[in-house]
Amino acid sequence: MSSLTDSQVNDLHCSIYRYVQWVSQNNGSSDLLNKLQSVLDIDELQLSLDDGDQMLLPKKWGSIIRLQRAITKLEQKCDALQQELDDKTKQLETIVPKDTQIATTTDVNWLPPDHIYASIQNESPVTAIKLHPSLAIVYVGTDTGRLIAYDILNYTIPLAVTTAHSKAITSIEVIEAHNFEEFIDSTTLVSTTSKDAQINVYDHSSNTGELKLIRSFNAHDSTVSSQKTWQKDNDVLLASSSRDATVKVWRVNDSRCLQSFSPHSEWVKSIDVLDEYILSGSLDSTLRLTHWPSGNGLSVGTGHEFPIERVLIIPFSDSKICTSPYRDQNEHSAFAPLRFKYCASAARDNTIKIWEVPLPQLKPNSAPVPSTTNTTFKCVMTLRGHTSWVKDLKLRGDHLFSCSDDETIKCWDLNTGNCVKTWSSIHNNFINCIDIDREATIEQFSPSLQREILVSGDMDNKVKIIR
């Protein structure tokens, strides 16, 4: 009774009295009622003031019984549904054994929807963005030099934040390195480049969730604008390009510079790497292909009217552009040692160009050298549609994604050169960077990785996620 108020106690006592009075009304049990009135300490005034229903308690008991019956029926229905689910699971296992890898339902030529899944506000313009290759994490670099990791599914609080550089971050690369140094199995290495001329490499620990700086080196004499990381055996390699007009290749394990060369006369804005080949684009408006272990320049592409902002190698594994019916299949097979035949470039002339790379001379046990007959890229497509600088390119299957200072993201069909979709209401300012899973990444992690995500960052301090 201690949990009831005085008013509730009085109401309960009166209800009990009224109920007993109703039960014994034909039995002449006035003595019982008098005793009950005395035990419950009910006076005549309380009874006269209480005009409650004598059937209140029976009604409540009836309600409880009906509620219990409903609960019992729901429990029986849940048991039946669980049994049905178990039976269906057993039937599926008889068709597809547990150890069979079911093909991913991810569509490599997926087109992101028009609506935004999430918008993440940052404290300064977003200058670089990168998806984790297998986890639902996006890494964001800002104009103030901060590196931030967000959980795509729960982005309200960052997973990790660090002040990586004293100036703006220009690029982010993420690699799951295996047998790297002191890490026994694998670890996530996050590398950043910056206008402060440094390259930093972080271990994003799955145990602590922190971004731990493990390598830092003064890479160039000026802004480091672009980078690519990859693993060869137990070595993690990193190629970087700079405003000092050089491209360098580093071994992250010991921070040693393995190669340095100057493919351009001006700022090397962007690079892409596939095995031993580096594609570079510059403020001199040209592209160049270099065999980086030897430093041999192999070919050059000219055709843009203004500086190049981004270059991209199109590997055979990532797109069917090289096996389209109108392509020369015999000639295509000759490019097998390179593993690519086409590349893309985006420039300040508002265009994107698709290039066919000339085949260099390939000799056994020798470094490739330029062809004696052709050292010039052939422009096979010019993609027009943006109305301002094209800032970034990403490839997924036969689709090429681009972003621009015109505040739009576009998707292009590499087989036809047509723009298949434009996102014009995602951002309200210059779009600096985008990222999306490439086909090779999807195949590598299939079937565990089944995601269709596009991320982008702009000058309005926002990261947008479309999925």
From Swiss-Prot:
- One GO process term, biological-process aspect: microtubule sliding
One CC-aspect GO term = cytoplasmic microtubule
Q: Where in the cell is it found?
A: Cytoplasm, Cytoskeleton; Cytoplasm, Cytoskeleton, Spindle pole
The record ties this protein, via InterPro entries, to: Dynein_regulator_LIS1 (IPR017252), G-protein_beta_WD-40_rep (IPR020472), LIS1_N (IPR037190), WD40/YVTN_repeat-like_dom_sf (IPR015943), WD40_repeat_dom_sf (IPR036322), WD40_rpt (IPR001680)
- The entry's keywords: Cell cycle, Cell division, Coiled coil, Cytoplasm, Cytoskeleton, Microtubule, Mitosis, Repeat, Transport, WD repeat
Note the coiled coil stretches, chain numbering.
Answer: 62-96
Q: Reply yes or no: does the keyword Transport apply.
A: yes
Any GO molecular function: identical protein binding
Q: Where are the WD repeats?
A: 121-160, 164-212, 219-262, 264-302, 325-365, 385-424, 426-466
Function summary: Positively regulates the activity of the minus-end directed microtubule motor protein dynein. Plays a central role in positioning the mitotic spindle at the bud neck during cell division. Targets cytoplasmic dynein to microtubule plus ends, thereby promoting dynein-mediated microtubule sliding along the bud cortex and consequently the movement of the mitotic spindle to the bud neck.
Subunit and partners: Self-associates. Interacts with NDL1 and dynein.
Family statement: Belongs to the WD repeat LIS1/nudF family.
- Write the protein's name: Nuclear distribution protein PAC1
Question: Which species expresses this protein natively?
Answer: Candida glabrata (strain ATCC 2001 / BCRC 20586 / JCM 3761 / NBRC 0622 / NRRL Y-65 / CBS 138) (Yeast)
Q: Which gene encodes it?
A: PAC1
